[in-house]
């Protein structure tokens, strides 16, 4: 009887069990609680507003593209981006060739990376010494050339050559997916597989575009094999084919609530895919094609001297990319700080 009264008594007029479940539910959203309590003004408030907008877009049935510029994979954003992919909070990714490969480099060579927290104090000789040790620096993080690049190279080259021998052609990300799903890299794994966004993407067969892939380590390696006559450039599908691939996907997926655009950084990873809308509208004369239906950019770039990456979202209206009514957000801050918080909020609420 005592147990009965304990479970079914009221607390402030609320049944005890309902009170407890509400507390548990509230406690299960620590990031939401934190940012809604303390992130109240300026860029902090913009972060909250943009996160809420992302959640609302998904709840209304919309789809979302995330674009990755900078060194997000080396920053290990994959730890939380992988979960976003697994939980269906992202439907398409556009990234640089560096982000495509550096997630896998971290996967197979993590223990060989070196942090250089005092990087601002390095002399030219210090930088040369890092080079001679086979370490390529990205701000405070050094990527080990032999363990990272070469471990991938010997396997990806085999896959390139095998495809060419069969007369097959694939996109850069499709070749990476083949390598991941073949299992040949598992012998090298140095981080939990759930922390790799590329593994999550490969397993979900997530659509990806990699504009300017040639500007990457694997792109350079592929070019070297073409120069040596061991591969044909046509074995790798081109950037133009990436645009037609994206155009087909956008046309099929932009109905209803439409597709949102979540841009991390600037550069080609964002510039390339956002142009699919004006291309379809103006060049294909598809006048019923919807604009991007949500827009957010995290960037430390400012509007000056013709900077496209630092342009305010409204400028994109003049280019036929966003509508007047498109929810628009810009968080002028460091993506390595903001993106994990925003993704955590989205995972807790969407």
Kindly give the residue locations of the regions a language model identified.
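Glycine-rich phosphate/diphosphate-binding loops that line cofactor/substrate pockets in enzymes
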Residues: 50-64, 200-204, 248-258
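Short acidic, glycine/serine/threonine-rich loops at helix termini
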Residues: 76-79, 104-110, 220-224, 273-276, ...
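Glycine-rich anion-binding loop/nest that anchors nucleotide
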Residues: 64-73, 93, 209-213, 233-308
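C-terminal functional extensions of proteins
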Residues: 42-45, 268, 275, 282-350
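Ligand-binding beta-strand-loop-alpha-helix segment within the catalytic cores
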Residues: 126-217
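N-terminal glycine-/serine-/threonine-rich phosphate-binding loop
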Residues: 24-90
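A generic, well-ordered mixed alpha/beta core segment in the N-terminal half of proteins
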Residues: 85-152
């Amino acid at each position: 009887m005592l147990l009965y009264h304990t479970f079914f008594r009221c607390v402030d007029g609320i049944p005890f069990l309902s009170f407890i479940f509400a507390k548990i539910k509230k406690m299960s959203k620590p990031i939401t609680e934190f940012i809604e309590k303390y992130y109240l003004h300026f860029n902090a408030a913009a972060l909250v507003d943009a996160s809420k907008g992302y959640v609302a877009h998904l709840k209304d049935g919309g789809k979302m593209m995330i674009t990755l510029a900078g060194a997000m994979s080396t920053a290990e954003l994959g730890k939380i981006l992988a979960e976003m992919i697994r939980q269906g909070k992202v439907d398409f990714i556009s990234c640089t060739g560096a982000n495509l490969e550096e997630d896998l480099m971290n996967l197979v060579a993590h223990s060989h990376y070196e942090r250089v927290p005092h990087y601002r104090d390095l002399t030219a000789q210090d930088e040369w010494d890092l080079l001679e040790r086979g370490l390529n620096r990205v701000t405070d993080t050094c990527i080990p050339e032999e363990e990272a690049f070469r471990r991938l190279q010997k396997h990806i080259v085999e896959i390139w050559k095998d495809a060419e021998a069969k007369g097959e052609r694939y996109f850069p990300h499709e070749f990476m997916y083949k390598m991941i799903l073949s299992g040949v890299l598992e012998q090298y794994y140095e981080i939990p597989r759930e922390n790799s966004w590329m593994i999550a993407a490969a397993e979900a067969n997530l659509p990806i575009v990699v504009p300017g892939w040639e500007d990457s380590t694997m792109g350079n390696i592929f070019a070297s094999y073409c120069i040596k006559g061991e591969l044909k450039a046509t074995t790798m599908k081109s950037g133009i084919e990436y645009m037609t691939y994206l155009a087909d996907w956008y046309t099929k997926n932009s109905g209803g609530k439409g597709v949102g655009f979540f841009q991390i950084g600037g550069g080609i990873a964002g510039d390339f895919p956002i142009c699919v809308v004006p291309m379809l509208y103006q060049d294909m004369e598809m006048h019923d094609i919807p604009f991007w239906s949500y827009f957010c950019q995290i960037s430390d770039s400012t509007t000056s001297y013709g900077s496209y990456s630092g342009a305010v979202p409204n400028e994109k209206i003049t280019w036929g990319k966003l509508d007047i009514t498109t929810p628009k957000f810009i968080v002028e801050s460091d993506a390595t700080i903001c993106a994990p918080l925003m993704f955590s909020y989205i995972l807790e609420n969407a």
